[in-house]
Amino acid sequence: MVRYILDHNLQDIDVEVFDCISGELNRQNSQLQLIASENFVSKAVLEAQGSIFTNKYAEGYPGKRYYCGCHFADIVENIAIERLCKLFGCKFANVQPHSGSQANQGVFAALLKPGDTVVGLSLDCGGHLTHGSAPSISGKWFNAVQYQVDRNTGLLDMDEIEKLVLEHKPTLLIAGSSAYPRTIDFKRFREIADKVGAYLLADIAHYAGLIAAGEFPSPFEYAHVVTSTTHKTLRGPRGAVIMTNYEDIHKKIQSSIFPGMQGGPLMHVIAAKAVAFGEALKPDFKDYAKQIIKNSRVLVEVFKERGLNIVTDGTDSHIVLVDLRPKGVTGKDAVLALERLGIICNKNAIPFDTEKPFVTSGLRFGSAAETSRGLQESEFREIGNMVCDVIDNLKASDIVKASVEQDVIKKVKELTFAFIS
């Protein structure tokens, strides 16, 4: 065993950081985690990410490293690549991107020139910053054109998207979102892209685990390139991947990630990705994905029963997006009240929201994390009612408010204790 300069446990050498980690463990165990972009990884994933690979610098790709001593780094990265390709049925993959944003930027660097036109879903309609939003590099370096959802239904209007693409003739068309709960017609997106000779990028960061399990439409038959994070419904470490069935595109992406965007890969994270991909290949992962959707649909049912407005009127995924305007409540007020009582979600803009980004008119919920913890329909029905109790209580008298809050705190404690991680 390597002898370290300071061969001590974290608790012995840095009590401040140890206390932060202990506190975060307690927070995750004692609160309901309903943020759509979060999940609970397995102990095996944590072990891999905290492994000795933390020490290894492995600049380059398997078999083509700029450093010696990369034998096992090569093996584990190849395992990750092989498992990922098997999981999604694709031919080529890069498992080195540190984040979803860097994965998307890697695609832009590989396929675009500064000033090229990119068409993606607008941020206020559920798109992601990296899909051409003004504050992002994607909105600064490229001519970003944004499509929107239908004002009445909240759904993607493919005919309007086609008109926009035909008008602006982009080099890249992006399909994907960060707050769109419904299925995406990747086939139609490819047909539209082909009409102007555009590349189609499918950003499946939110849906990857559901796609891997066959519970959400797959883009791989249609998209030129696919990006995803690894830490949402895929239930892996924080990181990202890029996949394609086109060898010429794969070669360009290899160069754009290294040496273009990144230097040394995070081998401990890649090891954890390999573990997570292996877990997702097991039969019980399909059961997990099915339960995710069942649980989110129960939330929709309860929210509707209690008078909340659901954007798109339902969900086909882990995401539930709620419009709070009929309740006269902002997302900011609701999310702070929920957090105080142990229910963690995020404030979120709804389509065509007029509130500021730090206020918003909506809430976004996700069912993936608590489904990992073992909660099913009956527990999610209880969660849905607790959420509605808190929202309805925001304008109640102080006496009523205190009573409701104590009841919710008690129920959250009982529920989290019964399913403690």
Swiss-Prot record:
Q: In which pathway does it act?
A: One-carbon metabolism; tetrahydrofolate interconversion; Amino-acid biosynthesis; glycine biosynthesis; glycine from L-serine: step 1/1
Q: Which PROSITE patterns match?
A: SHMT
What is this enzyme's EC?
Answer: 2.1.2.1
Query: Which chemical reaction does it catalyze?
Result: (6R)-5,10-methylene-5,6,7,8-tetrahydrofolate + glycine + H2O = (6S)-5,6,7,8-tetrahydrofolate + L-serine
Which GO terms label this protein's molecular function in UniProt?
Answer: glycine hydroxymethyltransferase activity; pyridoxal phosphate binding
Could you tell me the Gene Ontology terms of the biological process aspect for this record?
Answer: glycine biosynthetic process from serine; tetrahydrofolate interconversion
Q: Which InterPro entries match?
A: PyrdxlP-dep_Trfase (IPR015424), PyrdxlP-dep_Trfase_major (IPR015421), PyrdxlP-dep_Trfase_small (IPR015422), Ser_HO-MeTrfase (IPR001085), Ser_HO-MeTrfase-like (IPR049943), Ser_HO-MeTrfase_PLP_BS (IPR019798), SHMT-like_dom (IPR039429)
Q: Its GO CC terms? A: cytosol
The UniProt entry, under CDD domains, shows: SHMT (cd00378)
Which of UniProt's keywords are assigned here?
Amino-acid biosynthesis, Cytoplasm, One-carbon metabolism, Pyridoxal phosphate, Transferase
What the entry lists under Pfam families is as follows: SHMT
Q: Which residues carry this modification: N6-(pyridoxal phosphate)lysine?
A: 232
What assembly does the database describe for this protein?
Homodimer.
Q: Which HAMAP family match?
A: SHMT
What protein name applies here?
Serine hydroxymethyltransferase
Gene that this polypeptide is encoded by: glyA
